[in-house]
Amino acid sequence: MFKPCYLFAILFFLLPAVTFAQNDTWVAIQQKIDAKPFAGKNMRLTAAAKTESASTMAMLVVRVDNTDKKMGFFDNMEDRPIRQTAWKTYSIEGKINDNADTIHIGSICVGNGHFYFDDFLLEIETTPGNWSAVPLVNAGFETNTISKGLPEGWQYFMSNSEKFSFSFTTSQTYKGTYSLQVMGKDVEDMEGLNSYLSMQAFVKANYNKSEFQVPMRDGIRIYTIVYTPKDASSANKYPIMLNRTPYSIGPYGKDKFSSFIGPSETMIKEKYIFVHQDVRGRYMSEGVWTNMTPHIEKKKSKKDVDESSDTYDGIEWMLKNIPFHNGRVGQSGISYPGFYTTAGSINAHPALKAVSPQAPIADFFWDDFHHNGVFTQGYFWNFPIFGEPREKPTDQDWYQLFEKPTPDGYDFYRRAGTLKELGEKYYGKNFLWKEVTEHPNYDSFWQSRRIVKHLRNVKPAYLVVGGWFDAEDLYGALITYKEIEKNNPGAYNIITMGPFGHGDWAAETGHHKHHQLYWGDSLATFYQREIEGKFFRHFLKESGDRNTGLPDAYMFNTGKKEYEKFDQWPPTNVVRKKMYLGANESLQFEAPATIDYSSFVSDPSKPVPYTMDIEGSFGITPRNYMSEDQRFAASRPDVLVFETGELTEDITLGGEIKVNLSVSTTGSDADWVVKLIDVYPGNEPNSKYTPKGVTLAGYQHMVRSEIMRSRFRNSFENPEPMTPDKVTAIHFDLQDVLHTFKKGHRIMVQVQSSWFPAFDRNPQKYVPNIYKAEATDFIKATHKVFTNSFIEADVIK
């Protein structure tokens, strides 16, 4: 799920935009102070600072954490960053909450170059007009000792320790003998910072902001922020672009502006009337929130409301109350907002002309929290975001994420025990955890939330957007496009898939990488200008006659590293090929003459890790593994490796991939993880942007992967155990690809039975509900994969 800047700002103490949270462009330091003696009083942080150039950015930060683990006062100077090359004092003032526990003070540096800080001072207003200083450690950096890379008394909060260093300077002092000097070097992907800085000024200069409580048909009011171009008039009208989100549309207040008010810099500069709404039950909106609100097909009264009706009512209000619009509305959103975009397009308001569900959630049994019904344990940490009830409308986060006891997610989850034990310890009152654990199968609870089944007789034009390396909602993008195609002949429906992780097309990073692999320059900008911008411009500002000049499918080939155009997706100029998991762990294009098998022992106490990235295994959601080098897994005895010889010609796979396994187990349940891998030649050179310590020679690039639980082999609604030692057929989708395996490369398939902690462990002893499994239910089992197992894919002619 795509959580924008507001969550990242809280989690990382400092960040002004999602771009910085996702890239190695920033560093921060902090001190913690006991706030309890100062509860209810005013405070003021002052410090001197300067930057080497106006192309970099620094900020002071104050955050107050309350005793209830929720955040109180917070200011990171997002709206007034430090970009001065001369010394100047800056300050943050605010009130300490009555139930305050801890005050965090510090500074942030973003970008390359030198940053300077001195003379930190935290003061408390003891009586009206009288301020007293709170003791800080090394506030003026006169103790010129660097310990563990930091000045004495200060703690790290940083994105990349290799790209920032700290030292003391006597030549650039503000006060006393020394000042702190921070240096950013070789920081890549500065496009996001530069874009952020330029858009911040552009939005304030070119848009007016207004806020409203918009009534729905049942009386509930939805909080709405409107950004209108200043040059809008009766002679210069603009279309409306709507975004509905559960993640907060802040900053709230007519004088506080968001920097990225639209889908892209391109569209912001072209100008639209941008409308943002907190969805029902979230943040400043009234009502009660429901995850993946079930769609009501036949509404019988005003009390029958869903996301479709809320979108309809919102658009109706906009047309009547927002001046200078041209009568056309568009809607877009990434991840959860993508779900709301899909929902808004069903039984849509006639003015809704164009929509773009981007990495949309389609069905929680295949997106985000599950893959083929297997629980995505890597999501465990973010359950409070979606499962803690809100007491009343608020402009603050009301939930609290539990503190990570270690950055090593693999070790934490392995030692934490069963899902039952984890839930009892952390989420006893979390309603989403209760829903997930009480509905282990694809019952009516999940089926009612499958929004794509309602995509029939749709009217708006669609641009469906996804990323080939989207760990969260790859399924959602592909199935949304396919359901529209299948059930709506004649609808304008196009799709684009790029070399992106979840939502990464929304922010330009310059030299685009996913994890360790470089894919090209300015790819997000290309998408924003040539695909997304062109789509909305045509349907909202131009003729809307469907002659957009865009292909039905604009797909990035992850082997050739270039976009390709298709008249339809999946493509039809293909030959269906089978790749058999042959004897001696060979991968063959011919069926075996005799049936043999490969076997391995699966031990739930020693599961196969899904990544070698220790800290990445305990993130908000697992992401980088989608293109990760698989050599770490290939060497394990509980991972089977099937491989072709060196290819004598290019082979391009395009479209759906099917897995057909013939297996057995000594247990009564098992998981099956299948990974399709491009093995680079032994002489593959590194790119200019390959990270230090990484070699592409022999790199095992994971192209596509998926997990399947045996109990669901015949039905996701009615699971059943396996019969020990009985050969059993397991079929599932590996999802679509467009990838050229080049001459000299090898094609590899890995098969394993755990993928931890991205996904939960199978006990391998059948139990009706794995969420209720006891520790004694987890057993070792021997799995066999027979040589008549195969992967089926389309080879483009």
Please give the residue ranges for each predicted region:
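Extracellular and organelle-lumenal recognition/adhesion modules and their flexible linkers in secreted
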Residues: 20-195, 618-623, 627-628
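Bacterial Sec-dependent N-terminal signal peptides
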Residues: 1-22
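Alpha/beta-hydrolase fold nucleophile elbow
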Residues: 323-335
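Short beta-strand/loop motif that positions the catalytic acidic residue
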Residues: 464-466
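Cap/lid segment of the alpha/beta-hydrolase catalytic domain
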Residues: 231-320, 508-519, 668, 681, ...
